Amino acid sequence: ITILAMRRAMEDAGVDPADVDGLVIDPHTTTGAFWPADKPLPMDVIESYAQTDEPLDGITQLSAEWILKNTPELTGVNFTMNGVGCMSRAVTVAAQAIGDGMAHTCLVVKSWHNLEGRYYQGGAAASNETPGTAAVRGLWGTPACFGTALQFAEYCRKYGKSHDMMAPFMENSRRNGLMFPEGYWAQHRPEELTHEDYRAARWIAKPASLFDNDIPIMVSAAYLFTTAERAKDMKQKPVYILNHASSRGRPRSLTPTLDEVEEETAATGRKIYEGAGITADDLSFENM
């Protein structure tokens, strides 16, 4: 699906693969589980692709070497870099690479695998021991959403809000997802989310319920970044990136408090405006 996503991105942009000179990836594709050491490797799948020294390349991880070996039409790539973490990090690495002149046409791809179909069914979660500082963080079995759930609980107390107020937002998010033909919901579960569904959902980490969490899927997304000069002649109307920014504050404890999150978010927003040379009055919409 990684190779397919990349090829579709180039086709959608009307770009000749030979013109691509940059590649940014996230080498990590796991959603919590890794290939068990005692489980036989799927050699039939592995051997159907050009291989690297790491047999699980293309199965439970990615490398630029594996991608280039299996996408022979990418003949002009001379810049590769990893953007580790969320898709947003890989995207900003690609944007900065274009801005710094390290490439003029750059593919960026992020893939996720979840072979078990559930989160955290392998790796450390399958172990009988919790080593090192993980014992402090994970001994009580908190799910991945608990940090955000704690912050949301603080938000509700601070501003007099409730979990139910999120229902219209979540209903609209599902509605938007159903209008995205490439997405999971449109392809596999074309069903609306109702207010009653949302309110009746079981808690995962109160006040975060089932529908406040994402769903484990196998997916790959690819985007193409290029210079403004080249973008004007491509098939699709381009989106121009004015700036990107982040904030790297250190929380006082294991999970950032709401006050810390609000402070860092505000700092990021100010950096975005300053670097882009605009103010809030220039925005026609907000996406947060």
Label every PLM stretch briefly:
Residues 17-27, 77-82, 106-111, 164-172, ...:
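Beta-strand segments within the central parallel beta-sheet cores of soluble alpha/beta enzyme folds
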Residues 1, 8, 134, 167-171, ...:
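Condensing-enzyme catalytic core mediating Claisen C-C bond formation in acyl metabolism
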Residues 163-170, 179-181, 192-201, 235-236:
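Acidic-enriched catalytic cores of C-N bond-cleaving enzymes acting on peptides and small amides
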Residues 27, 31-105, 113-147, 188-213, ...:
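Conserved catalytic cysteine-centered active-site region
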Residues 7-21, 155-160, 268-282:
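Phosphate/pyrophosphate-binding loops at sites that engage ATP/ADP/AMP, CoA/4′-phosphopantetheine
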Residues 81-112, 145-182, 223-229:
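Active-site-proximal alpha-helical scaffold in enzymes
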Residues 1-7, 11-13, 17-29, 46-49:
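N-terminal beta1-alpha1-beta2 module of alpha/beta enzyme domains
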